[in-house]
Amino acid sequence: MLEQRNPAEALTVSVLNSQSQVTNKPLRDSVKQALRNYLSQLDGQDVNDLYELVLAEVEHPMLDMIMQYTRGNQTRAATMLGINRGTLRKKLKKYGMG
């Protein structure tokens, strides 16, 4: 579950720890762990387009949630994301969302 209590706080992910307690940790920690796992599985192989891979993993669900939150209002969604509406439309099309 992703949450942001106020704009000044980092996005957090709720995680169930080994003692069955739910804790919140910054989203960036989860991204780091996912990348660490991915890179450890490469076994020395080269990888291309890692930036695009990571961006797509984050950007697609972010766009989906923002569009749900704004009830499909692209102008409001673009404002929330800090991008212009044309850029938002391109990104929605890229992920088959618009």
Swiss-Prot record:
Name listed for the protein in its UniProt record: DNA-binding protein Fis
Keyword annotations from UniProtKB, A to Z: Activator, DNA-binding, Transcription, Transcription regulation
Record's keyword annotation contains Transcription regulation: yes
DNA-binding region, residue intervals: 74-93
Complex formation: Homodimer.
Tree of life domain: Bacteria
Pfam families attached to this UniProt entry: HTH_8
PANTHER family the UniProt entry points to: DNA-BINDING PROTEIN FIS (PTHR47918:SF1)
